[in-house]
Amino acid sequence: MASNNKDSQLMIALKDIVAGSIGGVGQVFTGHPLDTIKVRLQTQSVGNPIYSGTMDCLKKTISQEGFAGLYKGVASPLVGLSIMNSVMFLAYGQSKTLIQKLSDNPNEALDLKGLTAAGALAGIAIGFVDAPVDLFKSQMQVQQGDKNQYKSTADCAKQIWKVGGVRGVFQGLGATLVRDIPANACYFGAYELCRDFLASKDNISVNQLSSLQIMAAGGAGGVSYWTLTYPADVVKSTMQTDAIVKSQRKYKNMIDCASKIYKQQGIAGFYKGFTPCFIRSVPANAACFVLYEKARQIMS
């Protein structure tokens, strides 16, 4: 009996890993162009900005670099987000199981508080994968024109490791965790809440939801993720596009980074690039969740 239970838990974990990876690929291809615009707007100079807004950044990027410019740094999240989403869905599933076992009613489904707690725990695991992936991606995305320091994502990772070692690779980890822990609590909480609402409205089980309904719930999760934690993402991106060599950095740590952003730009500085990010959050996360759920159903 114990062996069967272990086999069942292992299969659930494997499904989360495979389905999460598939969802991650869909999320990258759908959302990366707007992510590039977001990072460029977040990290451009305050005194001499290159772009006046989202559309200006889009036009100039395509004009100067072609459509390929929108996919700069895509290799890092394509590999990294596949791994990250595998970790995310696995950690979320295992966290739900753990919280359920520790609850007063282990045989009952988790309430919203339990689901958001599971999302927060998953955010801790994700942060350690997310930090280096976002670092390589962001360093690549801010390169413009032909004057590129890095030839490829692999070259970027190699140079950062050579100059900064482990600390260099995990530059911005603190800010990543500050973002990822509450963000994933909101992300999964909103997704589960919306999914349950749509199922109860039509008097069906969540497994009977249509692809469009799953996409709607995924989009709601994405909006929740970014709306509440975007300022932390600005700090993270600013730190991760700073110099890798410690003596050349503008910011000592995330507190110093946040205080300098506020001093130079006010509250508005924490919302640079929010428009493309908000637009991206719906289709990218809709694609992620529908592919995850459908892949899981096929494997079942």
UniProtKB/Swiss-Prot annotation:
Mitochondrial solute carriers shuttle metabolites, nucleotides, and cofactors through the mitochondrial inner membrane. Mediates the transport of acylcarnitines of different length across the mitochondrial inner membrane from the cytosol to the mitochondrial matrix for their oxidation by the mitochondrial fatty acid-oxidation pathway. Induction: Up-regulated by phagocytic stimuli. Residues 31-72, 137-168, 233-272 are mitochondrial matrix. Belongs to the mitochondrial carrier (TC 2.A.29) family. One of its GO terms (molecular function) is transmembrane transporter activity. It comes from Dictyostelium discoideum. It is found in: Mitochondrion inner membrane. GO terms for cellular component: mitochondrial inner membrane. Its main location: mitochondrion. The keyword Mitochondrion applies. The lineage of its organism: Eukaryota, Amoebozoa, Evosea, Eumycetozoa, Dictyostelia. Residues 1-9, 94-115, 191-211, 293-300 are mitochondrial intermembrane. This is Mitochondrial substrate carrier family protein G. It comes from the Eukaryota. The chain crosses the membrane at residues 10-30, 73-93, 116-136, 169-190, 212-232, 273-292. Pfam families: Mito_carr. Coiled coil: none annotated. Solcar repeats lie at residues 11-98, 110-197, 209-298. It is a multi-pass membrane protein. InterPro entries: Mitochondrial_Carrier, Mitochondrial_sb/sol_carrier, Mt_carrier_dom_sf. Keywords: Membrane, Mitochondrion, Mitochondrion inner membrane, Repeat, Transmembrane, Transmembrane helix, Transport.
